[in-house]
Curated annotation (Swiss-Prot):
Taxonomic classification: Bacteria, Pseudomonadati, Pseudomonadota, Gammaproteobacteria, Pasteurellales
Region described as Disordered: 152-173
Record function comment: Heme chaperone required for the biogenesis of c-type cytochromes. Transiently binds heme delivered by CcmC and transfers the heme to apo-cytochromes in a process facilitated by CcmF and CcmH.
Annotated Gene Ontology cellular component terms: plasma membrane
Cytoplasmic side: 1-8
Protein name in the entry: Cytochrome c-type biogenesis protein CcmE
Topological relation to the membrane, as annotated: Single-pass type II membrane protein
UniProt source species: Haemophilus influenzae (strain PittEE)
Residues the record lists as binding heme: H131, Y135
Periplasmic face of the membrane: 30-173
Residue intervals passing through the bilayer: 9-29
Subcellular location: Cell inner membrane
Gene field: ccmE
Length: 173
């Protein structure tokens, strides 16, 4: 092999190794940030009722479900909150320290993100409250009222109820 070919070969090997190392580091970094989504039933029983597909203790996950009525316990001396979360099956316990979203309440759907500390206990770092498709934030609702009043649009129209819906309700009475 002549010296010119040798230097090209070294350059190609160097570039391929650089790309491989960069790809490996990217995959490793992304793997650290992947939070798999589970329902409370899947946390307890595994996905598709397969115990081999249960999240492991210490794994970062996201769990979505409904806050069980009567299970919200707040620590009076701190921002710690503990509540149960379920879907149609068994419930898991969520422990969270921080300010809960305004839409958080019992019987409401939420998504909690955190680390599974025991097989059925999630230490949440973030709690997101879900709302229905008709939700309008109060500030936006007020601004929309000001803009739409001159046009003759009623407040009920802004909350997802059309004139036809109101007529159907009145006709049913």
């Amino acid at each position: 092999m002549n010296p010119r070919r040798k230097s090209r070969f070294k350059l190609v090997i160097f570039v391929v190794l650089g790309i491989a190392i960069a790809s490996g580091l990217m995959l490793y970094a992304l793997r650290q940030n992947i939070d798999l989504f589970y329902t409370p039933s899947e946390v307890i029983q595994g996905k598709d009722n397969n115990p081999n597909q249960k999240p492991e203790v210490g794994q970062r996950i996201r769990v979505g479900g409904m806050v069980v009525e009567g299970t919200v316990v707040r620590d009076p001396k701190s921002l710690k909150v503990r509540f149960d979360l379920n879907d149609i099956g068994p419930a898991i316990t969520v422990e969270y320290e921080g300010i809960l979203p305004d839409l958080f309440r019992e019987g409401q759907g939420i998504v909690a993100q955190g680390v599974l500390t025991q097989s059925a206990v999630l230490s949440a770092t973030e709690v997101l409250a879900k709302h229905d498709e008709n939700y309008v934030p109060p500030e936006l609702g007020e601004k929309m009222q000001k803009v739409h009043k001159p046009m003759g649009i009623k407040a009920a129209d802004l909350k997802g109820e059309s004139a036809r819906d109101r007529q159907e309700k009145e006709g049913a009475k």
